[in-house]
């Protein structure tokens, strides 16, 4: 019997070590090394794609025909946008996200909308009966999508060879294993080798493959982090399970922009595309309520208006509480320090709670002005006019710094009927405001924004 060799591999970056180490010297992450046992006789073997093809020959650059090949229309405007206009032939796409966020639902309802293509759906997690029940819940239309429950990579290639599909779905890559690797499914070695073999198959046969990958809730599993270096496109499906909205982001895309964003609404019968997220994210009944400010934000390349809510109250306990949902807590603490140092509001003995309505997580610095405005509104118990929105980054000296794509932000606010928008004064340079129906209020400092909002 061959002697087994133990290797410790970082589940975050793939760095290996003959012994366990607490901190990875390559990526700097702690407690990410896991033990992998490999056999010497198979350690250098790689799984083959199972498709016989001719050996590639070097050619000159001018001999290569680079005609634009039509992409596969997935009949999903949001997914097509994030992919860059559709699915590229021969591409390997990874859709990652936390368990239960809706990855399988997104992919299954997408393939059910493509009757003109022959699709093979490989499931390693659910039975065919479970998939049938899920499909009936998503749509009543019939589909010729082929479904097979299989976890062996070699058997999957046999099914592909027999069916010759136009598109292959594998749900999920963590459940697939190859016989050439003596390791359990979902391990770093299995995930890496199986995905590399699938990539080779996709390129050799010009067949697009969509992989679904899980991210552990603790973030300790290898999963999509390792796959990012292998696949062509990485899509991140994120959101809070307690809220209805889901966001599809492009993390890596060799065939399109990574600035695109798709927004969905989770319903009982599946995911619904949200073409105008601003109308859903804004509350319709906050008249007379303090602590509410509307921000014109941009996620990816899409502008939309979001509702920033703040609650400021006297600290009941010894230490004041600070809490932020959907916004960086450290940045909120910085903005509170700016309010106290530059504007003169004493909030050191106040509890401050901040919430981005709708369960969204926003990283756009242009919502700084709305965060400060909502906090001031709650602290003074004074309402901000409902037809007023704002966009601006706040600096440490209390200045309102310019933001990008200001025309798109103003246009979104004007489209939804807002009458006023506060913007950085620097953004006003070179802007033609004569055709705008919305009133532009330029501000340079937080004090000016305070006077414009509260008099």
Predicted regions and their residues:
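P-loop (Walker A) phosphate-binding loop of NTP-binding proteins
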Residues: 98, 124
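Peripheral, non-AAA+ core regions of ATP-driven protein-machinery
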Residues: 2-12, 16-81, 88-94, 101-111, ...
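Conserved RecA-like ASCE P-loop NTPase motor core of nucleic-acid helicases/translocases
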Residues: 119-123
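Divalent metal-dependent catalytic cores for phosphoryl transfer on phosphate-bearing substrates
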Residues: 128
């Amino acid at each position: 019997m061959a002697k087994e060799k133990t290797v410790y591999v970082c589940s975050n970056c793939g760095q290996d070590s003959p012994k366990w180490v607490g901190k990875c010297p390559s990526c700097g992450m702690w407690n990410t090394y896991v033990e992998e046992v490999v056999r010497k006789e198979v350690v250098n073997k790689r799984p083959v794609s199972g498709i016989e093809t001719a050996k590639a020959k070097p050619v000159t650059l001018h001999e290569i025909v680079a005609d634009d090949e039509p992409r596969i229309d997935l009949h999903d405007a949001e997914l097509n946008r994030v992919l860059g206009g559709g699915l590229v032939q021969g591409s390997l796409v990874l859709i990652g996200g936390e368990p239960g966020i809706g990855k399988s639902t997104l992919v299954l309802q997408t393939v059910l909308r493509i009757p003109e293509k022959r699709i093979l759906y490989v499931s390693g997690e659910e039975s065919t009966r479970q998939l049938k029940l899920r499909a009936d819940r998503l749509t009543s239309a019939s589909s010729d999508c082929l479904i097979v429950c299989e976890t062996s990579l070699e058997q999957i290639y046999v099914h592909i060879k027999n069916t010759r599909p136009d598109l292959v779905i594998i749900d999920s890559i963590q459940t697939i294993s190859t016989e050439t690797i003596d390791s359990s499914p979902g391990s770093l070695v299995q995930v890496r080798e199986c995905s590399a073999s699938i990539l080779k198959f996709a390129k050799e046969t010009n067949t697009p493959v969509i992989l679904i990958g899980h991210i552990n809730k603790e973030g300790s599993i290898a999963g999509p982090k390792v796959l990012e270096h292998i696949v062509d496109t990485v899509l991140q499906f994120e959101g809070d399970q307690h809220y209805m909205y889901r966001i599809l982001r492009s993390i890596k895309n060799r065939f399109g922009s990574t600035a695109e964003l798709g927004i969905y609404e989770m319903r009982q019968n599946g995911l619904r595309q949200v073409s105008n997220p601003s109308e859903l994210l804004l509350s319709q009944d906050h008249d007379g309520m303090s602590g509410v400010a509307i921000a014109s934000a941009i996620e990816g390349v899409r502008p939309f208006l979001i509702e920033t809510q703040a609650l400021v109250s006297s600290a009941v306990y010894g230490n004041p509480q600070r809490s932020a949902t959907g916004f960086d807590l450290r940045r909120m603490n910085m903005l509170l320090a700016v309010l106290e140092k530059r504007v003169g509001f004493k909030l050191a003995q106040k509890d401050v709670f901040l919430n981005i309505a709708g369960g969204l997580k926003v990283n756009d610095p242009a919502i700084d002005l709305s965060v400060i405005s909502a906090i001031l509104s709650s602290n003074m118990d004074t309402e901000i006019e409902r037809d007023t929105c704002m966009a601006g980054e706040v600096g440490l000296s209390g200045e309102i710094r310019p933001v990008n794509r200001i025309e798109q932000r103003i246009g979104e606010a004007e489209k939804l009927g807002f009458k006023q928008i506060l913007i950085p004064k620097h953004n006003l340079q070179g802007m033609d405001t004569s055709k705008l129906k919305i009133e532009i209020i330029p501000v340079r400092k937080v004090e000016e924004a305070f006077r414009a909002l509260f008099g």
